[in-house]
Amino acid sequence: MSAVAIATLVIAAASMAAQSKPNFAGKWTFVPDSTGAIAPIGRGVGLGQEFTAVHDDKTLTVAMKDPQLGELKSVYNLDGSETRNPINFGGQTVDRASKVKWDGAKLVITTTISMGANVAEATQSWALDGSGNLLVETVSSFAAQSMTTKATYKKN
């Protein structure tokens, strides 16, 4: 195989890999399922009823309003390096340290939430379905208990 053919294959493969990563930018609204479930908020990782995402080559920035905490903004580095997005809850600082990785077309955000000696972990997976809806699955664990929530968001 010639060097030109190999170079063409490498460029094509890189281009296809880049295309498989969706862009999550936009304003998103929770879509209730048939059970009437409410939008997941909790343990510092839920996205609530509505949120806005700004997504560029380097970061994903998520802004939402929490009924107890007010406006929350989290910035995630897409290169896998850790980001810290502390929040103030009841006069105490809750540290949130996150790392992001791509699993094909799925964005996976793993966050460690620390408040004093209490530590929890949450892994949130973001993916677009065939209709362009955002599917978010969150697995949270604290004190040997695990909880999984699934939510669908529609882009406004």
Regions found by a protein language model. Name each.
Residues 17-156:
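Hydrophobic small-molecule pocket/channel-lining residues, especially in calycin-type beta-barrels
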Residues 1-2, 73:
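Generic secretory/membrane-interface signal
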